[in-house]
Amino acid sequence: MEAVIKVISSACKTYCGKTSPSKKEIGAMLSLLQKEGLLMSPSDLYSPGSWDPITAALSQRAMILGKSGELKTWGLVLGALKAAREEQVTSEQAKFWLGLGGGRVSPPGPECIEKPATERRIDKGEEVGETTVQRDAKMAPEETATPKTVGTSCYHCGTAIGCNCATASAPPPPYVGSGLYPSLAGVGEQQGQGGDTPPGAEQSRAEPGHAGQAPGPALTDWARVREELASTGPPVVAMPVVIKTEGPAWTPLEPKLITRLADTVRTKGLRSPITMAEVEALMSSPLLPHDVTNLMRVILGPAPYALWMDAWGVQLQTVIAAATRDPRHPANGQGRGERTNLNRLKGLADGMVGNPQGQAALLRPGELVAITASALQAFREVARLAEPAGPWADIMQGPSESFVDFANRLIKAVEGSDLPPSARAPVIIDCFRQKSQPDIQQLIRTAPSTLTTPGEIIKYVLDRQKTAPLTDQGIAAAMSSAIQPLIMAVVNRERDGQTGSGGRARGLCYTCGSPGHYQAQCPKKRKSGNSRERCQLCNGMGHNAKQCRKRDGNQGQRPGKGLSSGPWPGPEPPAVSLAMTMEHKDRPLVRVILTNTGSHPVKQRSVYITALLDSGADITIISEEDWPTDWPVMEAANPQIHGIGGGIPMRKSRDMIELGVINRDGSLERPLLLFPAVAMVRGSILGRDCLQGLGLRLTNLIGRATVLTVALHLAIPLKWKPDHTPVWIDQWPLPEGKLVALTQLVEKELQLGHIEPSLSCWNTPVFVIRKASGSYRLLHDLRAVNAKLVPFGAVQQGAPVLSALPRGWPLMVLDLKDCFFSIPLAEQDREAFAFTLPSVNNQAPARRFQWKVLPQGMTCSPTICQLVVGQVLEPLRLKHPSLCMLHYMDDLLLAASSHDGLEAAGEEVISTLERAGFTISPDKVQREPGVQYLGYKLGSTYVAPVGLVAEPRIATLWDVQKLVGSLQWLRPALGIPPRLMGPFYEQLRGSDPNEAREWNLDMKMAWREIVRLSTTAALERWDPALPLEGAVARCEQGAIGVLGQGLSTHPRPCLWLFSTQPTKAFTAWLEVLTLLITKLRASAVRTFGKEVDILLLPACFREDLPLPEGILLALKGFAGKIRSSDTPSIFDIARPLHVSLKVRVTDHPVPGPTVFTDASSSTHKGVVVWREGPRWEIKEIADLGASVQQLEARAVAMALLLWPTTPTNVVTDSAFVAKMLLKMGQEGVPSTAAAFILEDALSQRSAMAAVLHVRSHSEVPGFFTEGNDVADSQATFQAYPLREAKDLHTALHIGPRALSKACNISMQQAREVVQTCPHCNSAPALEAGVNPRGLGPLQIWQTDFTLEPRMAPRSWLAVTVDTASSAIVVTQHGRVTSVAVQHHWATAIAVLGRPKAIKTDNGSCFTSKSTREWLARWGIAHTTGIPGNSQGQAMVERANRLLKDRIRVLAEGDGFMKRIPTSKQGELLAKAMYALNHFERGENTKTPIQKHWRPTVLTEGPPVKIRIETGEWEKGWNVLVWGRGYAAVKNRDTDKVIWVPSRKVKPDITQKDEVTKKDEASPLFAGISDWIPWEDEQEGLQGETASNKQERPGEDTLAANES
């Protein structure tokens, strides 16, 4: 980038002169363009294709952010790039057109007239033969050195005027200033015939309105034209001829028009409005292509002409495209004839080349119009490119320059710039706001938002400038002009003896007190000294106003001294007499009389006060000291006045007050009626409402309105999502104490003007929290509103680096008080931030308010705050470019080169912010020494963070996260090395924020060192006079870098940088340092605005020359100095390490032993084999907890450590390990377990290692295949017995299939091992012996609730089934509660009896405390099944289905298709219970009630064996019950009864082998159905499926397994 900056800077100095931008500005612009993705690399700026997108993007950015610095720089750079490019193109095209370059192309001669394609080949640069110009170029030097003087004779034959040669058609190439090109010397002899009229044109020309040939055509006087033009410079001329609309007739133009145009171009330039007007006038009628080209040859130089030809061709292509789309386009002749094409429009078609007569005869009128219009548009573009205008960004309104002149210069520059047309109007308006005088800027800021064009802005400013300026003299002049007609009307009426309401109303006479006349006309001449007389000036007794001798503090003069008082009455009208001195040093004070017009009694009906004329105040304010105490006041709608000493409470007069201004002669001005404000101010103020009543219209105001916080034009509208429908969330109730606090806070915000009453359809809750001080804080829950907003993008990517402040510059820190509450919300967005102030018990309608300012908690508030404050400060940044101003949120830091400059700038910044409506806390203004900003303490030479706590409190993962975040903020300032951050990074592992963490010893030791570092280390402020240096080094657990000055001698660090955490399994140190160098260079440009001057590299790079490729890529474009030296002492705290560039691993075989490695996931072994003579040596390593990749890595590491000092070849079939080992050719940072294993092994070797990868199980014979097979067979060999298989599963919990393959056991054995594991079963099986159902009635019940909508409103049915007899009891309930459960069980006990145990799910109604106490009272055991698994209650679930099906059938039979009436529900439920309990089910011969009350005594069946957990078959058991998939067996010795899966039961026939299969034993069990009591029962329950047979944990091992 540095090289590109140098090239661009040099070009700017060449073509821009004094206005060229600095290298810093160019670098900042290039960085911005790369950051925004507009440039892939800085060198792309040379490509013209990127110029327009860059211009559009920077223009858009300037309009949005109001910052035009980069756009200004780009404008200068673009002008320089275009000038350089045009200069190069011009030199090449000039040679091309004149035949001076490598080509041999020249304008066509007469011999080309009959070859239409010739000129096309000329445009393409083809060689067409030797022409006139080429022959002239071969002249001798003495012939070409002296141009031939242009005379009045024929250029062709030398005869006098009137020869036929004057009409020869030889289109000349005349250029302005052609004497610069020697090859043009003498060309006039060959090209002087350029009258542009073909032979015979005189005879074929027809006059308008006549048919046939004209007998005497009017021709152009060519001799006169040549004489005229010869005196102005061009030696050769082509005369354009106008085509009239009446027909193909040519009307010659006045030669002086061409002469004047050529002279105008030479003197005024192409961009001159005069030039443009003359060209447009000359081309107002359609011209032929021949005439257009010759005209441009006359007025344009060689380079502009070449540019014009290209631009003309582009414009003609546009016409052709339009004509192609529209067959009836005028250029197509309204669809008659062939369509137009480029050859026709350029005059290159057959019969047109060099033949103006043919062009006039063949071209259509529509084509002529298109040709001329395209030529004129191309001329405009060439004028803009050939003579680029000055940069518009430098244009500022001068102190004495009028706004119109400034607007003229600005618009001309912008229109001539390269800005897109759509961006010009916004740029002009933005320049009006920033580049004009302050008073004009203020006028534009107060303009309505509907003014969107430059013309509207200009008209608005001119209209407002018609009034007098706001000065003392301006006020006097304005008031004099306003009152003068009033005085004249009064004088005329007095002279005529008339009175009426049309003039000024007469006040009271100050002599007699009577109305209708004034003191001068009073018939009663009172004597002086009368004690009853009151003075109207001093309010004293005993004298009148003329006799008043009271002196003010104005050197003994009364107010109004110095203003003339004309005679009254008299022949002349009186002059304006005001009670104020119109001087800048005096305050404009007036005497005022206030009269209360109310009807209630008061002590004083009128009072006299002195008030200040303040055109900056919106309203009239009477001081509390001047306001009579018995005059009533009331609360105002806006209870605060802002702008007069801050926020001041205000009240308003309840009665209408008549206000009159007393003139110097004692006369009273026209009284006004108003309701003034009353406030505690130092003096009364007459605002604009009073001044306008006096006839003054003050519109060009300076400063903001006094009753606003921040002008509304600074409000930034919010962006809403497309579905931003109003959100209404009810206000939740608040306790009385918090409600009182909320009411007080709302009233306070209302008085401050932050909120306003609302009727919005939006609502979100508000609440209060108690602060540590005991007071309350108002909070607004805006989460629902934020969800509807489109968040603004970040406008500040991070906090500024404070060490970049110039060393020794004094500092000042400002704090904006309540910044959010000083910025208004856009009016259309306020309703979305409404809230409700509730009342207790709804005693009154709730009061609703909405925010007028930025509310805290809105997602866009911080961004808007930054944008608004930045917009206010932007003019100051432009005005004081040398001032360093840091702005972060509501904190400002100013730095200047001197204390005086800092104080002056600080005062200006404060006044600017206060005028904008912000408040600066005086106690928050910091000056040196001891300045603190953004958590740092700044001195004149250093920047240090504020001290850390002694030892933080760490209890959870979230505490560690917050601590690490704080340390990351301090690392760039303290240089905390990676080794001190390691213990804290270790504690960040985990995903639960509440996971427990402890403050361990490693963290404590690291923290102590960090605290000690914070007391001794600090950043040094940057000295711009010294070179900026950068250094990088490898250290423990990472790499570290620093930007500073004097790093190798007396280190002064300015910024620390660190390598990032590795993202790959292994990262070489060379790559780590490469990334750090790139980061260091980018940080230098971003922070200090410049590239590093000196870069210090580790000493290893000095020994390894040339530099590695990665380092060279990181140094691309670096123009500073590179030094390689030992590690600077500044890195001692990081414990630097040496960087080795030695290659440790290669992929080519090396001389040495060859070893083979392999690992197996089935055996969890890694092996290394190598051949020793005829025998293979083997080493193994086993780890049941390691992955196969780790086993492969450990096997390779074991092979590497066999011969550490001997080159070794390692052959592996693991592509993963082979690729990783090759990447570890140089030292680096591992980040995975496998990488750590390999890095540890490589670090212990001193010899080269080669890693060779082979494919496993390949058929290729040879040594490598043999060795790999040996390693593979050793890794996979294992013979696990059953006990070892169980141990393997206990360690790894692998599945049965993997266990069978790994241990070489059967699938059946593997499943049994897995089923015995309590952790691997989704439904863990309980020990054998827990009965899943009762062997007799009242042993085990199952209870559940089921929903039956037909039984609404009491639609919940509690169902209990006896697991032995299948008897069902059902009760109906409205809700599922503990009371309902207890009522149901009590009913079931009353019907069936008390059970020993009840089994349910784990619902809250079954597990509540009251239910447990109820069961304990009845002595009933209670068990629960799997949470949320209804299939654990198999019998009751089937009973639910049977019950609901029976209810449906009975209801439909009674005609109730949907809901059962409440009156019928009890009867129908009883019917269902009766049908289920008292009738046989299916093929059963007994009913459930019979089974329940008359149970069958179980008899023991044949002897059986059962399979226990060890896999052995145990004898001594007899069958009691045999069901579908399960069996109950009884031990013959202990009488213990247990339930086991049927597949674990087989007959106890000793003569059979123990491996008798199940199908062999089935005939034995086929005949036992006579004594199995459960068989009928199972069929009666409609048959169990495999899923329905699964019971709760603890019931049946079979059920758990089959699930």
Curated annotation (Swiss-Prot):
Mg(2+) 2 binds at D1158, E1192, D1213, D1272. Residues 1149-1280 form the RNase H type-1 domain. Signal peptide: none annotated. Mg(2+) 3 binds at D1344, D1401, E1437. Residues 1333-1496 form the Integrase catalytic domain. GO terms for biological process: DNA integration; DNA recombination; establishment of integrated proviral latency; proteolysis; symbiont entry into host cell; viral genome integration into host DNA; viral translational frameshifting. The record marks 155-156, 166-167, 177-178, 239-240, 476-477, 479-480, 488-489, 577-578, 708-709, 1280-1281, 1567-1568 as: Cleavage. Residues 217-259, 290-298, 351-362 are annotated as: Involved in capsid protein dimerization. Keywords: Aspartyl protease, Capsid protein, DNA integration, DNA recombination, DNA-binding, DNA-directed DNA polymerase, Endonuclease, Hydrolase, Magnesium, Metal-binding, Multifunctional enzyme, Nuclease, Nucleotidyltransferase, Protease, Repeat, RNA-binding, RNA-directed DNA polymerase, Transferase, Viral genome integration, Viral nucleoprotein, Virion, Virus entry into host cell, Zinc, Zinc-finger. Capsid protein p27: Self-associates to form the irregular polyhedron core composed of hexamers and pentamers, that encapsulates the genomic RNA-nucleocapsid complex. Assembles as a tube in vitro. Binds to inositol hexakisphosphate (IP6), which allows the assembly of the polyhedral capsid. This is Gag-Pol polyprotein. It comes from Rous sarcoma virus subgroup C (strain Prague). The lineage of its organism: Viruses, Riboviria, Pararnavirae, Artverviricota, Revtraviricetes.
